[in-house]
């Protein structure tokens, strides 16, 4: 990770850390790096529903126009929508303003290249070097060479029309509950599923600039679980603030996470001869039960570090077409270049419709090991990971597990947290292991 770019672009508290001044520089320097070979480069900008999105969009646009880029504002749209449209419209770059599942005071900026993929570490480093340069030596066009800005709010509909082409069925006869996290999918998802003839009921679809992710969405699926049971829905689909994740809820109100969704999709793709190399890419956070279920179906798995960018890198490198994270980032590389909540939702409901089976039955084939994750707020996450007492307690816990479970301790890519996760045969054992490690981290490096 660099000075500004974390695992998912630039993030920070809007107007404190991620200021309009910094956003202007990011637009100017990022736009230059991504468009320097084009004469009148085209750059798309989308945003989620945060109140700070307008401020950051204005600053980014100014930076881009100052190097001669033509800017197309997409308005409120999902992150995967920006990724798709960047490639589909032949733009040199796409930019999404969002902090995904983070609280409303945070915001972020992430770039996509002309192929719709996120930037490489080398490209991010080049942008950072220009931002920190003591003197701005970038071009300063004047007159007719300056960039112009136009709105392309119909981009969202173009993206939805593309998504509909990825499935075979309509959803008539199905009652589908949506939770849009008061975020980027609030109008898009409702339109999409209604257009596919589902009986759609929604919650978390009234954004006011301040309520994104607040007690709703994929990080709070218990709200949707209650809604599904109350309304008698066949399935619940929860997105996060920028629409790149999906967590589902079955007809009984049970939460179906990214591992289970990946398993269902992997099995179906294998059955229909479309799972490339009979392999799924996941991260080290995936449940042991996920790997056992895949193995039983004759499906191989590859693990990466946490972060959908690492999953995508592995998929591109070795020609796989399905991968994702337990948190609900699922990548169907045949259809899009990044995690896509609405695309994943379509594939999942399509499988339910084709098989004529409820989600509880499809997800029930994968037996999850009890898993517990605790976040510990720390003064310095890198130092915490290198602390001798922390290393010692992790080694002790791993020795006690003796192969019957696992522990994973890692720094958050976007927040000052250390995440402590354990899997074990019982919930009590998980809790014991996690708290033992978390207590040491709190004692040695915790925030008072």
From Swiss-Prot:
| Name of the protein | Phosphoglucosamine mutase
Keywords, comma-separated and alphabetical: Isomerase, Magnesium, Metal-binding, Phosphoprotein
A single GO BP: UDP-N-acetylglucosamine biosynthetic process
Q: Where does Mg(2+) bind?
A: 100, 240, 242, 244
Q: Phosphoserine is carried by which residues?
A: 100
Pfam families with a match to the protein in the record: PGM_PMM_I (PF02878), PGM_PMM_II (PF02879), PGM_PMM_III (PF02880), PGM_PMM_IV (PF00408)
- A GO-annotated cellular component: cytosol
Q: Which cofactor does it need?
A: Mg(2+)
Q: Which domain of life is it from?
A: Bacteria
Q: Which family does it belong to?
A: Belongs to the phosphohexose mutase family.
| Catalytic activity of the protein | alpha-D-glucosamine 1-phosphate = D-glucosamine 6-phosphate
What's noted about post-translational modification? Answer: Activated by phosphorylation.
State the protein's purpose: Catalyzes the conversion of glucosamine-6-phosphate to glucosamine-1-phosphate.
The protein's matches in SUPFAM superfamilies, at most eight in alphabetical order, are given as: Phosphoglucomutase, C-terminal domain, Phosphoglucomutase, first 3 domains
Q: What is the lineage of its organism?
A: Bacteria, Bacillati, Bacillota, Bacilli, Bacillales
Active-site residues per Swiss-Prot or TrEMBL entry? 100 (phosphoserine intermediate)
* PANTHER family according to UniProt: PHOSPHOGLUCOMUTASE (ALPHA-D-GLUCOSE-1,6-BISPHOSPHATE-DEPENDENT), PHOSPHOHEXOSE MUTASE
Fetch the Gene3D superfamilies from UniProt.
Answer: Alpha-D-Glucose-1,6-Bisphosphate, subunit A, domain 3, Alpha-D-phosphohexomutase, C-terminal domain
Please report the organism this UniProt entry assigns to the protein. Geobacillus thermodenitrificans (strain NG80-2)
Provide the cofactor note recorded for this chain's UniProt entry: Binds 1 Mg(2+) ion per subunit.
EC no. given is 5.4.2.10
Q: Which GO terms describe its molecular function?
A: magnesium ion binding; phosphoglucosamine mutase activity; phosphomannomutase activity
């Amino acid at each position: 990770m660099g000075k500004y770019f974390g695992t998912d672009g630039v993030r920070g508290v809007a107007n404190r850390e991620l200021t309009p001044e910094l956003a202007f520089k990011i637009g100017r320097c990022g736009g230059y790096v991504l468009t320097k070979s084009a004469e009148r480069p085209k750059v798309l900008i989308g945003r989620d529903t945060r109140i700070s999105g307008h401020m950051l969009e204005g600053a980014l646009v100014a930076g881009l126009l100052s190097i001669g880029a033509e800017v197309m504002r997409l308005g409120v749209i999902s992150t995967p929508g920006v990724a798709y449209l960047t490639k589909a419209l032949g733009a040199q770059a796409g930019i999404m303003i969002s902090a995904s599942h983070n609280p409303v005071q945070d915001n972020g900026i992430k770039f996509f290249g002309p192929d719709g993929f996120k930037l490489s570490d080398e490209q991010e480093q080049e942008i950072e070097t220009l931002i920190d340069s003591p003197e701005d030596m970038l071009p300063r066009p004047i007159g007719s060479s300056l960039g112009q800005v136009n709105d392309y709010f119909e981009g969202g509909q173009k993206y939805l029309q593309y998504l509909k082409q990825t499935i075979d069925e309509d959803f008539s006869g199905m009652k589908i509950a949506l939770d849009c996290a008061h975020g980027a999918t609030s109008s898009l998802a409702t339109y999409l599923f209604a257009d596919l003839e589902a009986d759609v009921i929604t919650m978390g679809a009234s954004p006011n600039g301040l309520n994104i992710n607040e007690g709703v969405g994929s990080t709070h699926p218990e709200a949707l679980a209650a809604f599904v049971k109350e309304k008698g829905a066949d399935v619940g689909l929860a997105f996060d603030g920028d629409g790149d994740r999906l967590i589902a809820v079955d007809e009984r109100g049970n939460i179906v996470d990214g591992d289970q969704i990946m398993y269902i999709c992997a099995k179906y793709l294998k059955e229909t001869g479309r799972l490339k190399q009979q392999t799924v890419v996941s991260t080290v956070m995936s449940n042991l039960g996920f790997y056992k279920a895949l193995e039983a179906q004759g499906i191989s798995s590859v693990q990466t570090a946490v972060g959908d960018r690492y999953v995508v890198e592995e998929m591109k490198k070795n020609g796989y077409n399905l991968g994702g994270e337990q948190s609900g980032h699922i990548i169907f590389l045949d259809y899009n270049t990044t995690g896509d909540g609405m695309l994943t939702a379509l594939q999942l409901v399509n499988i339910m419709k084709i098989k004529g089976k409820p989600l509880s039955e499809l997800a029930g084939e994968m037996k999850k090991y009890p898993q517990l994750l605790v976040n510990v707020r720390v003064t310095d996450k890198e130092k915490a990971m290198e602390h001798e007492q922390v290393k010692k307690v992790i080694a002790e816990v791993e020795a006690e597990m003796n192969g019957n479970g696992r522990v994973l301790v890692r720094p958050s890519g976007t927040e000052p947290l250390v995440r402590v996760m354990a899997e074990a045969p019982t919930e009590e054992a998980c809790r014991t292991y996690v708290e033992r490690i978390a207590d040491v981290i709190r004692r040695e490096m915790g925030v008072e």
